[in-house]
């Protein structure tokens, strides 16, 4: 198989890159270790609302992925899902062969790594017997908000995920208890204000400074969560239907460590002007890329995608792009607006 660009990672930034490359008449293959496109957006929080996508006051993660796939579809990107890139070999004539764990080989002129946080898994709290409850009444992500209708939920954690899901699930849950080791939450001031309002209204209860201590129940069904005060060691039992621990993700760059690319703090170091890595014709964009002043935002990843694609075009064709706005260029198969 041959193409212009191999994109490693089928998250929102990777999918958008197929569109951006297509606008420059470059073909793409996209490889991802997950069994469906969307990255964390579909794997961990498909119903989570996103508020900072231009033109959308609010859009769910799943809907964003669907829209991005529709946007890129005229350019017919080829997806290789449930596959992990093991090796990127240099060929003669300034090209690569990208090889996956199941033997798929794709020859290309450039590679864009849009692998997000790499291979990830949620951090599991050290609670005895927790495996019995996982995927039954203990979950590390929210796939369907309706599953929590009129339920009592314990949410553990003090970051954005814990705070954001507390706000969202408070719309359907009977009661939410938020367990955190500290009084301060690592979330936006606006979200913190919402938490305080929800607590005043009795929709949630902030249980601080406490940590998870023990689970009670049987046959995979939780009946209570026991928490312990950090200072006094006092224990408190909270009746609950579900526990949602949000303690972040464990990153594993896996084979990326062996690709001969400069890394820093488990990220790929890039030139912020071009998104080039230390290896010629290999680029990195989105959360996996690091440079001074980096903002880990989806919209920033979209901009990085455009910058990388324009530089790749210049490298491949040995000349800069003859720039055209999308309104002038149009998209094959799509009618221009009158």
UniProtKB/Swiss-Prot annotation:
Cofactor note: Binds 1 FAD per subunit.
Single GO MF descriptor: NADP binding
Alphabetical UniProt keywords: FAD, Flavoprotein, NADP, Oxidoreductase
Highest taxon above the source species: Bacteria
EC number(s) on file: 1.18.1.2
InterPro entries, alphabetized: FAD/NAD-bd_sf, FAD/NAD-binding_dom, Fd--NADP_Rdtase_type_2, Ferredoxin-NADP_redctase_2
Gene3D superfamilies reported in the protein's UniProt record: FAD/NAD(P)-binding domain
Required cofactor(s): FAD
Binding site for FAD: 32, 40, 45, 85, 120, 287, 327
SUPFAM superfamilies linked: FAD/NAD(P)-binding domain
Matches recorded under Pfam families: Pyr_redox_2 (PF07992)
Leader peptide range in chain numbering: none
Catalytic activity: 2 reduced [2Fe-2S]-[ferredoxin] + NADP(+) + H(+) = 2 oxidized [2Fe-2S]-[ferredoxin] + NADPH
Quaternary structure note: Homodimer.
PANTHER family per UniProt: THIOREDOXIN REDUCTASE 1-RELATED-RELATED
Sequence similarity: Belongs to the ferredoxin--NADP reductase type 2 family.
Protein name: Ferredoxin--NADP reductase
């Amino acid at each position: 198989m041959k193409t212009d660009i191999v994109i490693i990672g089928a998250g929102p930034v990777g999918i958008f890159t197929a569109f951006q490359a297509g606008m420059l008449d470059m073909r793409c293959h996209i490889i991802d270790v997950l069994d469906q496109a969307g990255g964390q957006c579909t794997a961990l929080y498909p119903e989570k609302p996103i508020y900072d996508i231009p033109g959308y006051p609010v859009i769910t993660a799943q809907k964003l992925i669907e829209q991005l796939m529709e946007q890129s579809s005229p350019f017919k990107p080829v997806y290789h899902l449930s596959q992990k890139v093991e090796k990127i070999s240099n060929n003669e004539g300034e090209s690569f062969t990208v090889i996956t764990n199941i033997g798929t080989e794709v020859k290309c002129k450039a590679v864009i790594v849009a692998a997000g946080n790499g291979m990830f898994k949620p951090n599991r709290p050290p609670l005895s017997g927790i495996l019995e409850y996982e995927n039954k009444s203990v979950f590390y992500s929210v796939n369907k908000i309706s599953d929590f209708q009129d339920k009592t939920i314990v949410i553990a954690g003090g970051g954005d995920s814990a705070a954001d899901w507390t706000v969202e699930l408070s719309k359907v849950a009977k009661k939410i208890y938020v367990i955190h080791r500290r009084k301060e939450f690592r979330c936006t001031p606006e979200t913190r204000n919402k938490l305080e309002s929800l607590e005043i209204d009795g929709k949630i209860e902030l249980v601080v400074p406490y940590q998870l201590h023990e689970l009670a129940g049987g046959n995979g069904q939780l009946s209570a969560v026991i928490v312990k005060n950090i200072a006094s060691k006092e224990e408190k039992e909270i009746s609950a239907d579900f526990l949602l621990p949000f303690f972040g993700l464990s990153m594993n760059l896996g084979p990326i460590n062996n690709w001969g690319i400069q890394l820093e703090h488990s990220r790929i170091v890039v030139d912020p002007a071009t998104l080039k890595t230390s290896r010629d014709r290999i680029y990195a964009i989105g959360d996996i890329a690091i440079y001074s002043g980096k903002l880990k935002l989806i919209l920033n990843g979209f901009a990085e995608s455009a910058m990388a694609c324009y530089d790749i075009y210049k490298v491949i064709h040995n000349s800069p792009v003859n720039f055209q706005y999308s309104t002038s260029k149009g998209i094959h198969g799509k009618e221009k607006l009158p």
